């Protein structure tokens, strides 16, 4: 079997080796070490951040690496099966209706991929490998066995970055959070009696729900598959229990005994018929039908499946032991124990003895607890689709077994693979969980792959989800981030996996804890699920301990069950968090001083980092958190060296390394490619020829990374002060230097595609010969009619010339005769060239041509397809949105000349002015601390160890932070960063500039001077470096204006929105405003000739062109629509003229309107449809 697209080589992905390779990342040439303020040493590294995707897919297809890992963990005695093997085993054998013939499928295997990832993107096809299975047909009558290898279809493969290529675009399959199969006990309060009533649901992975409940009359009832309720003893009797057996098992319960007395059935047959009547009302019941209905509902594996996770949950909840682990259907013992649990819960008991003798707690379940919610990861989601496809195929196989001749049947003649490939294709193309990958920057892609969604098939819907399911739960700790979730209708339904979390075999999220024994920390790390964690006492990572790991504090604050906080002795602690950042996601862990930010703003900060566009020059933040390197490393956008060796060759697009073992590794860099979001994907080398490189070292940066660290923005010198009202309400004032030096400049690439098709009137043609177009317009087109690379284009310019045959009018017999004698005249064609869309400019950086003549695979009816890539360099400008990492966002309100900006005592002008009002009420104080530490990192500091005033400071800081040079990078990890006292102390010890002056005092403030007058401002101002991101909300993509354009077919009013080239809506309230000002003529103009007076607007255009006065408006179309609406309600409404005669409002002026348009040579409606559609 060929290893395809499983996880990357193990040294990059696995635990301890990963930790080693992370250490080597510090040795990147030119990569400075971050000075960390962390006090806590983490016992383990952050695990592979893409493992949730890669491991799940590796399980599905059973890669050799995955099998080796499983064998290592489970031992050789346990058989390891992949997800595809499981599903084929579950399906096989498929038997015909008589049981004489059977077909078994096994041994799925993959052949080599047909295309590389780049070829798939280029040709708009799927990145997939052919899947084959061994099909074995057995004729039980003749004992004949026929075995064949059958091609099932092309199976989409995961790239080593955890994505899929579907139809040439990169997609991500998001993990789904669903309620786990199992048994759930619930309590509700009866409104009339105010007594607690209890119920239980047995929820399978597939099949009928079984619900028991106690009602206010104290009878125990059952509902099968949400049908009508009946006494529970009817079900027990239908299962073959006698009254004596029921009394023996449930005699302790009065409510069960009273239910038994009043159930109205005396034996098994009556009970079965009673159940059948309730389940299938209106049908004539028989004993056999009733028996098979009950068996099919709960005891047949084809119809009822608890799944491994469901069996595990049932056994765990009811204390049933592991004897029935392989059984995926319900047993009578399951049902009886569930009932016993329910009646004891209703009676108020707190414990019970299970059938295996185990004492188990009796309590209701919290459905929002992460012990009761599990993840369907990518492998399981695809497996479910394969199951759907195979079950559809199974029906076809059965039918063919009965219709074909038994002698001539072969496995290939029975199998129709279309349903399987259709189910897989449908999932990747249309499922809510298969999403267009967010490639805005490296972080957004990484976060997308780690996303957890409660939406989708089998999950919740936005409308039905209440507050409880969206809320943060104590069991999310270390599993799902409490901060990172969208604002808006999906809040709380979409989350992000926490930094250290992993998913176990059952789909439950586990988080690591460090074992504590008798108050002493050990090196043992245990991964616990949420319900396992409830049994232990867990302390925070910042517990004080000595060098031997013994906890020194007299008492420790801990978490116990349900997230309650207690203070206990060190000996009572079972576990310790492995890291302070364990509870938050990757994006949240990249917010410095997170502990000083309000949660709402931190949420915005985490989300806005994903919207940052990669800049032309990336710069690592002065103030980081230590997560930047791990995030960039695992995001998959860096080029990482596989083997130690020496760099042999470096260019902009290729790096060659001669490895120590004599092999040569070549790495190809991706240059100026377009991402899904239109940002620029570019990789740049970090090494030089002759450099020694180790395995795991970064060779090249990707977009938005710098020296192997995630670098989404730039460090700018910021001053917190109001300035002439220009930064009122979160507006931002920028220095012109930022524009001139391309500090916040980004490159955006747009793709334009056109195809030449066969039409009814003949084929379209890509050509330079375009009718009625001057040579000046064609200057940048080559001889084929395609724009040259390097051409500067703007809106309206032709990118690809194309002509489409025009429909010819019916010829008279005389004309036909003349045509036959003198031959064809030049065919009539019209210009349908591809032009640069409105509002876009840029430089052509790439052209791809696909043609049927070159054997390219094109859609039916398409002869040629051209793709043109236009790149645009966007400098920062008024109206662009900027943000920090703390949810502090704003729009550029003014760009000031450098000489007008406030400047520091040494003459340095600040880069950006933020308003102070943006801080206090939003409670994101982290940004202020970031500014102070940013200044320190840029200026450097040196602590005078002899000065007694620094004694406290020296105690808290490690030695490598005593003397730090200017321009250093610092790390302040979340919940374990620099304290206020440390920052204040360091500000008092910051290094002076070259003139020997300290610019910023110990309060973090400086005296600023007004750039216009040179006078100092009256108060000191907080100044320092803040990391600023440029977000994707760019004014270039939002600004829009329309003169003429398309109109709605019904109302004849202009369309709305930039995409439709629409107009501005002049709504009801705007009309009131015009009325209030008495602007009658302006209002009339807005409601008629500028909107839906069809004839009037053409006449106005004509008047403007000819320089005449504007004519009077006519009747708007919407008035005619209103009349027709009233007439359709049988109300005879007429319009009377001034003299009382009825007026005709039909389109009598249409001819005049057409003539006016034709005479002016205009098409006022600017029909935006593609010309191919018209043809």
From Swiss-Prot:
Chain intervals with Basic and acidic residues compositional bias: 1165-1175
A Pfam family annotated for this UniProt entry: RNA_pol_Rpb2_2
Record EC number: 2.7.7.6
GO terms under biological process: DNA-templated transcription
GO cellular component: DNA-directed RNA polymerase complex
Catalytic activity: RNA(n) + a ribonucleoside 5'-triphosphate = RNA(n+1) + diphosphate
TM helices/strands, residue ranges: none
Record InterPro entries: DNA-dir_RNA_pol_bsu_ext_1_sf (IPR042107), DNA-dir_RNA_pol_bsu_external_1 (IPR019462), DNA-dir_RNA_pol_su2 (IPR015712), DNA-dir_RNAP_su2_dom (IPR007120), DNA-dir_RNAP_su2_hyb_sf (IPR037033), RNA_pol_bsu_bac (IPR010243), RNA_pol_bsu_CS (IPR007121), RNA_pol_bsu_protrusion (IPR007644)
Enzyme class per UniProt: transferase
Keyword annotations of the record: DNA-directed RNA polymerase, Nucleotidyltransferase, Transcription, Transferase
Record's function text: DNA-dependent RNA polymerase catalyzes the transcription of DNA into RNA using the four ribonucleoside triphosphates as substrates.
Family according to the record: Belongs to the RNA polymerase beta chain family.
Protein's recorded name: DNA-directed RNA polymerase subunit beta
Gene that specifies this protein: rpoB
């Amino acid at each position: 079997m060929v290893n395809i697209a499983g996880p990357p080589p193990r040294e990059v992905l696995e635990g301890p080796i990963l930790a080693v390779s992370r250490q080597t990342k510090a040795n990147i040439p030119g990569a400075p070490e971050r000075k960390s303020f962390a006090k806590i040493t983490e016992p383990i590294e952050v695990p592979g951040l893409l493992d949730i995707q890669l491991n799940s897919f590796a399980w599905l297809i059973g890669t050799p690496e995955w099998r080796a890992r499983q064998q290592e963990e489970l031992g050789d005695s346990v058989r390891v099966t992949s997800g595809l093997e499981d599903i084929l085993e579950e399906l096989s054998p498929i038997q015909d209706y008589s049981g004489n013939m059977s077909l078994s499928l096994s041994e799925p295997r993959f052949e080599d991929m047909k295309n590389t990832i780049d070829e798939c993107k280029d040709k708009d096809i799927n990145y997939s490998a052919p899947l084959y299975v061994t099909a074995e047909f057995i004729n039980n009558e003749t004992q004949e066995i026929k075995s064949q290898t059958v091609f099932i279809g092309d199976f989409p493969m995961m790239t080593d970055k955890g994505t899929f290529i579907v139809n040439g675009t990169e997609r991500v399959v998001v993990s789904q959070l669903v309620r786990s199969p199992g048994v759930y006990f619930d309590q509700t309060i009866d409104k009339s009696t105010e007594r607690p009533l209890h119920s239980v649901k047995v929820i399978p992975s597939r099949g009928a729900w079984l619900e028991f409940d106690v009602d206010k009359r104290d009878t125990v009832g059952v509902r099968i598959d949400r049908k009508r309720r009946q006494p529970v003893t009817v079900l027990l009797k239908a299962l073959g229990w006698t009254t004596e057996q029921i009394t023996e098992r449930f005699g302790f319960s009065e409510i069960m005994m009273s239910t038994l007395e009043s159930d109205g059935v005396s034996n098994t047959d009556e009970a079965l018929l009673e159940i059948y009547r309730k389940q299938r009302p209106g049908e004539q019941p028989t004993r056999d039908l009733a028996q098979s209905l009950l068996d099919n509902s709960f005891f047949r594996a084809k119809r009822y499946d608890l799944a491994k996770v469901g069996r595990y949950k049932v056994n765990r909840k009811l204390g049933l032991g592991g004897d029935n682990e392989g059984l995926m259907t319900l047993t009578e013992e399951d049902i009886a124990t569930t009932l016993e649990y329910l009646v004891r819960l209703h009676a108020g008991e707190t414990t019970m003895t299970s059938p295996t003798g185990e004492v188990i707690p009796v309590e209701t379940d919290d459905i929002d607890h992460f012990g009761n919610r599990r993840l369907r990861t990518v492998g399981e989601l695809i497996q479910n689709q394969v199951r759907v496809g195979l079950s559809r195929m199974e029906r076809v196989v059965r039918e063919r077994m009965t219709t074909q001749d038994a002698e001539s049947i072969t496995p290939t003649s029975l199998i129709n693979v279309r349903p399987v490939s259709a189910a897989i294709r449908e999932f990747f193309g249309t499922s809510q969980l298969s999403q267009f990958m967010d490639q805005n920057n490296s972080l957004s892609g990484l976060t997308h792959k780690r996303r957890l969604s409660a939406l989708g098939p089998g999950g919740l819907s936005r409308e039905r989800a209440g507050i409880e399911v969206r809320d943060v739960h104590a069991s999310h700790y270390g599993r799902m981030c409490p901060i990172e979730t969208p604002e808006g209708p999906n809040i709380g339904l979409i989350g992000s996996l926490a930094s250290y979390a992993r998913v176990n075999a059952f789909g439950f999220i586990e988080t690591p804890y460090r074992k504590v024994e008798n108050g002493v920390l050990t090196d043992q790390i245990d991964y616990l699920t949420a319900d396992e964690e409830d049994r232990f006492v867990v302390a925070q990572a910042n517990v004080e301990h000595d060098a031997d790991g013994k906890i020194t504090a007299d008492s420790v604050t801990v978490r116990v069950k349900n997230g309650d906080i207690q203070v206990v002795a060190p000996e009572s602690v079972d576990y310790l968090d492995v890291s302070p950042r364990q509870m938050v996601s990757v994006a949240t862990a990249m917010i410095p001083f997170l502990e000083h930010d309000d949660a709402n703003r931190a949420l915005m900060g985490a989300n806005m980092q994903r919207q940052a566009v990669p800049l032309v020059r990336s710069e690592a933040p002065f103030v980081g958190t230590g997560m930047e390197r791990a995030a960039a490393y695992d995001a998959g956008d860096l080029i990482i060296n596989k083997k130690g060796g020496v760099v042999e060759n470096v260019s902009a697009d290729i790096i060659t390394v001669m490895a120590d073992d004599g092999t040569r590794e070549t790495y190809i860099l991706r240059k100026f490619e377009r991402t899904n979001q239109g940002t620029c994907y570019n990789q740049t080398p970090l090494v030089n020829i002759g450099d020694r490189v180790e395995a795991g070292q970064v060779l090249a940066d990707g977009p938005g990374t710098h020296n192997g660290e995630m670098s989404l923005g730039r460090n700018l010198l910021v001053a917190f002060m109001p300035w002439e009202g220009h930064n009122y309400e979160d507006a931002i004032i920028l220095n012109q230097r930022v524009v001139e030096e391309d500090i916040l400049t980004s490159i955006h690439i747009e793709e334009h595609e056109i195809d030449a098709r066969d039409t009814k009137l003949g084929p379209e043609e890509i050509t330079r010969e375009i009718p009625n177009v001057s040579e000046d317009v064609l200057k940048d087109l080559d001889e084929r009619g395609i724009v040259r690379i390097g051409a500067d284009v703007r809106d309206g310019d032709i990118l690809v010339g194309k002509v489409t045959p025009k429909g010819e009018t019916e010829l008279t017999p005389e004309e036909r005769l003349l045509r036959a004698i003198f031959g064809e005249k030049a065919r009539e064609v019209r210009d349908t060239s591809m032009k640069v869309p409105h509002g876009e400019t840029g430089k052509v950086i790439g052209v791809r041509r696909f043609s049927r003549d070159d054997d390219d695979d094109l859609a039916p009816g398409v002869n040629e397809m051209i793709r043109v890539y236009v790149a645009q360099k966007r400098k920062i400008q008024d109206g662009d949105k900027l943000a920090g990492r703390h949810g502090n966002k704003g729009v550029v309100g003014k760009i000031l000349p450098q000489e007008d900006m406030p400047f520091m005592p040494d003459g340095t002008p600040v880069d950006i002015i933020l308003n102070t009002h943006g801080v206090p009420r939003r409670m994101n104080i982290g940004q202020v601390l970031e500014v102070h530490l940013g200044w320190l990192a840029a200026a450097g500091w040196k602590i005078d160890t002899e000065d007694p005033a620094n004694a406290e400071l020296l105690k808290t800081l490690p030695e490598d932070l005593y003397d730090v040079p200017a321009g250093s990078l610092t790390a302040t990890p979340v919940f374990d960063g620099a304290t206020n006292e440390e920052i204040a102390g360091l500000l008092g010890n910051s290094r002076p500039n070259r003139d020997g002056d300290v610019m910023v005092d110990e309060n973090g403030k400086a005296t600023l001077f007004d750039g216009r007058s040179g006078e100092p401002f009256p108060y000191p101002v907080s100044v320092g470096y803040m990391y600023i991101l440029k977000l994707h909300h760019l004014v270039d993509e939002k600004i829009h204006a329309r003169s003429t354009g398309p109109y709605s077919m019904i109302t004849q009013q202009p369309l709305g929105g930039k995409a439709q080239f629409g107009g501005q809506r002049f709504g009801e309230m705007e009309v009131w405003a015009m009325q209030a000002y008495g602007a009658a003529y302006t209002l009339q103009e807005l409601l008629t000739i500028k909107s839906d007076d069809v004839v009037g607007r053409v006449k106005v255009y004509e008047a403007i062109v000819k320089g005449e006065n504007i004519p009077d408006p006519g009747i708007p179309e919407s008035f005619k629509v209103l009349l027709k609406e009233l007439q359709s309600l049988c109300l005879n409404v007429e319009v009377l003229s001034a003299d009382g005669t009825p007026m005709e409002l039909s389109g009598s002026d249409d001819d005049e309107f057409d003539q006016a348009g034709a005479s002016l040579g205009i098409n006022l409606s600017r029909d935006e449809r593609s010309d191919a559609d018209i043809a």
